[in-house]
């Protein structure tokens, strides 16, 4: 029974990984990246998330290794705190409260007790670089208010600040200026690009900066794709710079290798360029990284690089420019055209991913499963280029078929449209292209749906298009005597008075097809393709259309653009009820009759859950999001919950996920976020000595089971312990005031003996059968024992003697029994 | 990381006949040799023994042809009236034929005069055959009777009078000397057993039966009339399949030497080849006149077809082309390849597999390196534009997608631009290429408009293109008019409101495309 709290909206999974540069651990085993309010620790070898460091209350804006202790990590956040973590155990060590919003964090090995942060103090768009002195204190929370100003009027992004040559200077760029602050001299030099006054060449403003680790050399990236290497900048007059030009678009990030022999740069071309010896001739490329390179970072050991990409991915690259691992989050780079879908096989969330791909994202493990390349063309990442977009996708026949639609429209008249049908192949466990249809319609396809009835023998697909037609596609046997082949062909084309077809939907049993033509809903018989009836409410174009399910299958729901939700009864062919609701998203639950509708108002979005049979909603939650909600989907639960309260019953069998305009994936939950943490993430506590390899997971699991067994036995013993409290000796010892007790030395033996006694009786009770055997054994061993006791008697002939001897023999007995037990287990094992 | 993805070349369904192994096999014949006979060729029969001569029955003569001779090597012409159905015995030494006057004559291949004459039929004998034991002859005649003759003493052994119309076809079983089959115009096919005095099986074909054929195993029977029907003899004459691929009466049947294919010739001037497993047509031959007879030589080496106009068409299989071994390019010695092949892996060795190299087309290699003009040059080469225009179009489309089509088309001299214009002129009006090429044509016009008039060659090409576009616009207008008329007709015929039927149209050109020159 789950404790029923209020239903809350929780952010689930898929947070950004590419917000800031990733940071490597000193031994390159782990990589850290900021992810919303958390810091995530990944293994560089297995790509698994090892820890999630949570504690910040706002966006984490910077992370750096503690230069004094490589097992610790600093992080700063917009909540105004700097936190120090032990990343191996995932423990928060210390919190420094600064008090103002922190935008970036830098550490220097030379400045031992202070870190540098970017803050904005006075005005919202003026940022300063300040150094914060971190006070030494043993307490968990420390106030760090000692700020000293370093540089003013700088760019907010940490890419525009770099510390160089072991902390001798700091370089900052903004627009057309490069300023260098020397810590020793406490002076600032400012350099301006000569051409910046000339308006014609105004595209060369600075985008990022990096400093050579050992030499006095600053590299700066520019908007026009050039990289400038500045030298001799100690002198305002005699400074020089050289140009490296390969990028044709903005340089997004720069990084020097640890030794400084090579410079890495990346940009929109999705190519990592390595400039060797800072010359234009010696360059190496790692092309086709998939998306714009946002950040580049280098491991302190120098063996790995990593690039963060705009499609929410981190690629770990070996020194010899070979990609070795990819950490992929939910791709959020681009707008979602396909909406949210659930793959019936993997239960993964499916939506637009990388350009031209569909991504399969596991909600349970918050991890991308795989990308399906739909468009299968070389991706040219260039500004202003009209790309082929994957606009529609649908799963059919229990995941056996996938239909996708891609389009590219350069001008009004030039539309490229392609529909592809993919079949699931059990052997390869993936989708294989079956049929490709060029220009299935004359205009954009607005809706796509499969007939998912259980008893349908022939897979059927319906597409609705703006050209006024809807087409029915069926799978036909195309095989001849030479080869077997199945393909999709058009079976029927329907239209209604040349109106644009906007939505289509099959009823649950597949017997009826509803197609909306602007304001009119038409119902077609799916066997004969005859028009059965039409509904028209004259309340604006139909935006959403869906049939009721299970007991409510006689109802058809339609939401119009003018904010009317209508429910028609298919038996009486009349309007059952309507409601004024500006529905943005309407999704039926596949496991129940419920339908979720999200309405949009000026204040925010509200959720209504209702059954088509009654106009009164089951559940209303106002203000689920301040933004527009774009898509929603019901995800069937693996294990049904059992909420008894009527308001929460709709969450029993499915969970509702929705995606807002800023592409954050949210859901409804009654649990607190700590509870929601999956046990898997807790299992992955990596031990220091063990690298997290697949073997570790096998062996580690095994060991864990053993540990659990041990724990169980320990628990059993622990349970028995309270009984020992009843023993008078102990209670006497514990409850008598200390000053009236005899000396501890005297009491000790008594206390220990009492414990032993109780223990002995317990075990005897536990294994009554063993007792006999024990006795036998005792008799067998009696000779020895007697010898021993005699010896004891010989050595110590004190008054107390007898009692102690007796006790000792008892303890002896116990030990013997222990040995015997081990013996037996060993025999059993044989 | 993912490698370079080659440009997807749009594939278009190949119109016309599909190329299968059957079409390749049955097309692999030389051009037919035509031999003029005196009358309609009613029967062609190959000798089952080498040298595989064949007997052709036409009018009152029987000609024996050698396989590659165009003149008959022997002629039997002692018939008073039309001869029918000259058939070789299994050993190829005897020949039997029926005739219009009701006689059945047996010839020795080497002799001239008939060895035996079987008299007994009162009307024309259209079918004769040897039984499997070689010593009997079966004949069917227009007097509705089927007779069995003994060769040694030229006597009639049995007479079956079960048919109620002309008996026009028959064949003897190749396994059992006592079984034979006849087909008649009374719509039945009957199986007779010489050991009994009546038919053992009768199937109703439904139309007059023109030809029958028994499979070598004897399990299946094929009868041809208006349609070809296949019967399962082991199930007591159950109809297996009815083949309705000819649109006139089927006159002759034949099995290929492998027994895998069934051939049928018909009055509709076609020979069709069926698979005997699926009974689907796998190939079809066309002839000049209605076909009356058909025969295949041993190993399908020759197809002989006799027609109503007396023409005998003989097709010989092409001899297996001996491939001229090209002078081999000098390659590295075998030792180079074998070097290190048998090296055993040592303990500390790390095996590094070389990744398989992906082969890229030349244009793909250029595109991979962003050499766009070069890639376009490559596909505008005349060998590519004529043979595989879809590759050229796909590359133009890809360049357009990359937004560099204008760059790739610009800066060309007279010769190069005329290459491009030639390609456009040839392919612009094809509906499958039109959307891409119209866009390319517009870009070309935009680029080269300022320099127009400098080269008479290019100017002529532009004028040609303009004429083409104008013609196409007229054509499209006409099509739209036709479509409008058809719409009107459909509208009058439509029964129900609301439903509509899509008319498939070949929309090619939006009309707003004007090419100026």
UniProtKB/Swiss-Prot annotation, chain A:
Component of the proposed t-UTP subcomplex of the ribosomal small subunit (SSU) processome. SSU processome is composed of more than 70 proteins and the RNA chaperone small nucleolar RNA (snoRNA) U3. It is found in: Nucleus, Nucleolus. InterPro entries: Quinoprotein_ADH-like_sf (IPR011047), WD40/YVTN_repeat-like_dom_sf (IPR015943), WD40_rpt (IPR001680), WDR75 (IPR053826). Residues 763-806 are annotated as: Disordered. The keyword Glycosyltransferase does not apply. This is WD repeat-containing protein 75. Residues 769-787 have a biased composition (Acidic residues). PANTHER family: WD REPEAT-CONTAINING PROTEIN 75. GO terms for molecular function: RNA binding. The gene is WDR75. It comes from the Eukaryota.
């Amino acid at each position: 029974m789950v404790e029923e709290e209020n239903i809350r909206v929780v952010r689930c999974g898929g947070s950004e990984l590419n917000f800031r540069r990733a940071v490597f651990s000193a031994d390159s085993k782990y990589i850290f990246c900021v992810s919303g309010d958390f810091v995530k620790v990944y293994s560089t070898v297995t790509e698994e998330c090892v820890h999630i460091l949570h504690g910040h209350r706002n966006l984490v804006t910077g992370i750096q290794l503690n230069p004094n202790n490589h097992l610790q990590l600093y992080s700063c956040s917009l909540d105004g705190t700097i936190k120090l973590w032990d990343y191996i155990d995932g423990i928060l060590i210390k919190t420094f409260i600064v008090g103002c919003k922190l935008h970036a964090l830098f550490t220097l090995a030379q400045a031992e007790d202070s870190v540098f942060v970017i803050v904005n103090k006075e005005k919202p768009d003026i940022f300063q670089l300040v150094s914060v002195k971190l006070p030494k204190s043993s307490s968990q929370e420390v106030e760090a208010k000692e700020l000293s100003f370093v540089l003013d009027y700088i760019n907010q992004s940490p890419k525009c600040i770099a510390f160089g040559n072991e902390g001798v200077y700091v370089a900052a760029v903004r627009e057309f200026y490069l300023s260098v602050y020397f810590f020793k001299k406490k002076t600032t030099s400012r350099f301006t690009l000569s051409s910046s006054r000339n308006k014609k060449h105004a595209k060369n403003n600075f985008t990022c900066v990096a400093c050579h680790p050992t030499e006095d050399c600053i590299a700066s990236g520019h908007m026009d794709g050039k990289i400038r290497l500045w030298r001799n900048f100690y002198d305002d007059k005699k400074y020089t710079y050289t140009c490296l030009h390969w990028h044709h678009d903005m340089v997004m990030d720069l990084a020097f290798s640890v030794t400084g022999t090579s410079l890495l740069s990346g940009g929109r071309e999705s190519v990592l360029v390595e400039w060797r010896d800072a010359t234009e001739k010696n360059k190496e490329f790692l092309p086709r990284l998939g998306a714009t390179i946002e950040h580049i970072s280098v491991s302190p050991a120098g063996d790995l690089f990593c690039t963060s990409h705009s499609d929410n991915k981190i690629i770990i690259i070996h020194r010899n420019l070979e990609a070795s691992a990819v950490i992929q989050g939910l791709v959020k780079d681009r707008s979602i055209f396909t909406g949210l879908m659930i793959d019936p096989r993997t239960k993964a969330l499916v939506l637009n991913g990388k350009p031209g791909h569909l991504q399969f994202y596991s909600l349970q493990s918050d991890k991308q499963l795989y990308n399906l390349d739909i468009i299968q063309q070389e991706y040219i990442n260039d500004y202003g280029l009209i790309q082929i977009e994957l606009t529609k996708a649908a799963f059919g026949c229990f995941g056996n078929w996938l239909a996708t639609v891609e389009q590219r429209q350069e001008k009004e008249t030039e539309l490229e449209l392609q529909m592809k049908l993919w079949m699931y192949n059990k052997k390869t466990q993936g989708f294989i292209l079956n049929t490709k249809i060029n220009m299935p319609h004359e205009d954009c396809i607005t809706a796509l749906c499969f007939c998912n009835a259980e008893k349908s023998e022939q897979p059927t697909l319906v597409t609705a298009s703006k050209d006024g037609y809807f087409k029915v596609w069926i799978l036909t046997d195309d095989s001849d005597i030479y080869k077997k082949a199945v393909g999709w062909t058009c079976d029927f084309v329907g239209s209604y008075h040349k109106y644009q077809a906007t939505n289509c939907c099959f009823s649950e049993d597949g017997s009826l097809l509803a197609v909306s033509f602007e304001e009119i809903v038409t119902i077609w018989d799916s066997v004969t393709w005859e028009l059965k009836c039409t509904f028209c409410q004259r309340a604006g174009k139909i935006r959403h259309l869906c049939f009721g399910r299970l007991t409510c299958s006689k109802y058809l729901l339609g939401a119009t653009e003018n904010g009317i939700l209508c429910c028609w009864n298919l038996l009486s062919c009349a309007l059952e009820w309507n409601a004024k609701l500006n529905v943005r998203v309407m999704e039926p639950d596949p496991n129940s009759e419920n339908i979720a509708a999200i309405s949009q108002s000026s204040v925010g979005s509200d959720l209504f859950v209702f059954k088509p049979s009654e106009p009164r909603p089951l559940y209303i939650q106002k203000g689920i999001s301040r933004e527009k909600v774009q898509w929603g989907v019901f995800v069937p639960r693996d294990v049904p919950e059992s909420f008894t309260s009527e308001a929460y019953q709709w969450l029993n069998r499915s969970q509702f996920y929705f995606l807002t305009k800023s592409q954050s994936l949210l859901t409804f939950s009654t649990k607190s976020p700590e509870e929601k943490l999956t046990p898997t993430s807790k299992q992955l506590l990596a031990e220091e000595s063990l690298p997290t390899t697949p073997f570790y997971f096998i062996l580690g699991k095994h060991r864990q089971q053993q540990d659990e067994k041990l724990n169980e036995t320990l628990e059993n013993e622990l349970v028995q312990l309270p009984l020992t409290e009843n023993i008078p000796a102990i209670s006497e010892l514990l409850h008598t005031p200390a000053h009236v007790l005899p000396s501890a030395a005297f009491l000790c033996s008594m206390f220990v003996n009492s414990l032993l006694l109780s223990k002995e009786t317990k075990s005897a009770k536990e294994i009554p059968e063993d007792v006999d055997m024990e006795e036998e054994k005792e008799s067998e061993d009696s000779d020895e024992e007697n010898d021993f006791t005699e010896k004891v008697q010989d050595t110590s002939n004190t008054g107390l003697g007898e009692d102690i001897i007796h006790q000792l023999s008892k303890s002896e007995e116990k030990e013997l029994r222990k040995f015997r037990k081990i013996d037996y287990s060993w025999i059993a094992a044989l | 990381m993912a490698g370079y993805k080659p440009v997807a070349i749009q594939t278009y369904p190949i119109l016309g006949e599909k190329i299968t192994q059957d079409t390749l096999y049955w097309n692999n014949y030389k051009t037919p040799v035509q031999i003029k006979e005196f009358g309609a060729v009613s029967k062609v029969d190959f000798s089952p023994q080498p040298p595989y001569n064949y007997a052709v029955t036409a009018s009152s003569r029987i000609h024996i042809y050698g396989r590659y001779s165009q003149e008959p090597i022997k002629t039997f012409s002692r018939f008073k009236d039309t001869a029918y159905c000259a058939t070789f015995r299994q050993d190829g030494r005897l020949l039997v034929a029926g005739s219009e006057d009701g006689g059945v004559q047996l010839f020795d291949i080497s002799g001239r005069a008939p060895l035996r004459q079987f008299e007994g039929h009162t009307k024309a004998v259209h079918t004769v055959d040897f039984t499997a034991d070689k010593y009997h002859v079966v004949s069917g005649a227009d007097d509705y009777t089927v007779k069995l003759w003994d060769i040694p003493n030229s006597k009639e052994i049995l007479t079956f009078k079960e048919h109620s119309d002309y008996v026009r076809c028959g064949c003897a079983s190749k396994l059992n000397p006592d079984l034979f089959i006849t087909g008649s115009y009374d719509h039945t096919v009957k199986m007779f057993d010489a050991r009994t005095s009546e038919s053992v099986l009768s199937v109703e074909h439904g139309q007059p039966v023109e030809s029958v054929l028994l499979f070598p195993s004897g399990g299946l029977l094929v009868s041809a009339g208006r349609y070809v029907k296949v019967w399962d003899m082991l199930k007591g004459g159950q109809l297996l399949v009815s083949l309705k691929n000819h649109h006139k009466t089927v006159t002759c049947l034949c099995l290929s030497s492998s027994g895998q294919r069934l051939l049928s010739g018909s009055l509709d001037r076609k020979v069709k080849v069926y698979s005997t497993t699926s009974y689907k047509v796998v190939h079809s031959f066309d002839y000049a006149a209605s076909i009356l007879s058909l025969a295949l030589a041993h190993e399908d080496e020759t197809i002989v077809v006799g027609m109503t106009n007396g023409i005998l068409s003989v097709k010989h299989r092409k001899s297996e082309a001996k491939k001229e071994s090209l002078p081999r390019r000098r390659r590295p010695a075998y030792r180079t390849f074998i070097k290190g092949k048998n090296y055993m892996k040592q303990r500390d060795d790390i095996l590094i597999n070389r990744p398989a190299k992906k082969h890229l087309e030349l244009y793909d290699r250029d595109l991979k390196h962003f050499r766009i003009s070069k890639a376009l040059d490559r596909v505008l080469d005349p060998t590519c534009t004529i043979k595989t225009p879809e590759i050229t179009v796909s590359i133009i489309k890809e360049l357009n997608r990359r937004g560099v089509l204008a760059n790739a088309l610009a800066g060309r001299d007279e010769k190069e631009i005329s290459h491009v214009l030639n390609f456009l002129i040839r392919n612009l009006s094809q509906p499958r290429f039109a959307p891409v090429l119209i866009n390319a044509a517009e870009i070309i016009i935009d680029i080269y408009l300022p320099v127009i008039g400098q080269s008479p060659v290019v100017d002529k090409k532009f004028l040609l293109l303009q004429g083409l576009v104008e013609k196409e616009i007229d054509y499209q207008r006409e099509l739209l008019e036709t479509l409008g008329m058809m719409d009107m007709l459909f509208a009058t015929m439509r029964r129900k409101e609301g439903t509509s039927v899509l008319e498939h149209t070949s929309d090619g050109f939006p009309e707003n495309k004007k090419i100026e020159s």
